[in-house]
Amino acid sequence: MRDQFICLALLLCALHSACGLYFHISETERKCFIEEVPDETTVIVNYKVELYDPRSNGFMPSSPGIGMHVEVRDSDDKIILSRVYSSQGRISFTSHTPGEHVICMYSNSTAWFSGAQLRVHLDIQVGEHAIDYANVAQKEKLTELQLRIRQLLDQVEQITKEQNYQRYREERFRHTSESTNSRVLWWSLAQTLVLVCMGFWQMRHLKSFFEAKKLV
């Protein structure tokens, strides 16, 4: 029983959705990331911008004048967030439709020299992994056991959302497949009808030709 509980806990931990990375961008470059998010799910984006210093051949904290323009589009290509933030920040939004959400970032400054680079550290957290449980425990005065139960309940809720999202994707795929199969069927029938009509026309044409030549 204990081994089963450990396996379940490991499985739940594996289902955390988070990614941490960094990337380089130039002054006019735009970087976008696609995150598949179930509906009614919180997404947290943490970022930090560093400016390349040619004297030290490394990256240093960027000046206050350099910020990042962040734009988020949902699966319907609607803008749900678009604004300029400082060189370091934390962005939060909640999805209202399931599907691919596109997070785009680019610099809002043209003050730095051409050829310079920015390094952007990015960490995207989705679902219950985005919840600050230390803050929750402090606000709600939860014991360690109560906090752990809260975490497990949130994980189960996130798993349910993921399952619903997978069913939604399967339904969309099935609808697309059925629509494609229907179009292929009607196109095949149309081709067959055209061939039959052409064959009938050729037969009549040949018959008229033979009758004109008095061969039949």
Swiss-Prot record:
Residues 134-164 form a coiled coil. GO terms for cellular component: endoplasmic reticulum membrane. A motif (Prevents secretion from ER) lies at residues 213-216. One of its GO terms (biological process) is dorsal/ventral pattern formation. Residues 204-216 are cytoplasmic. Eca and bai are essential, though not redundant, for dorsoventral patterning of the embryo. Specifically required during early embryogenesis for the activity of maternal tkv, while the zygotic tkv is not affected. Involved in Golgi organization. This is Transmembrane emp24 domain-containing protein eca. It comes from Drosophila pseudoobscura pseudoobscura.
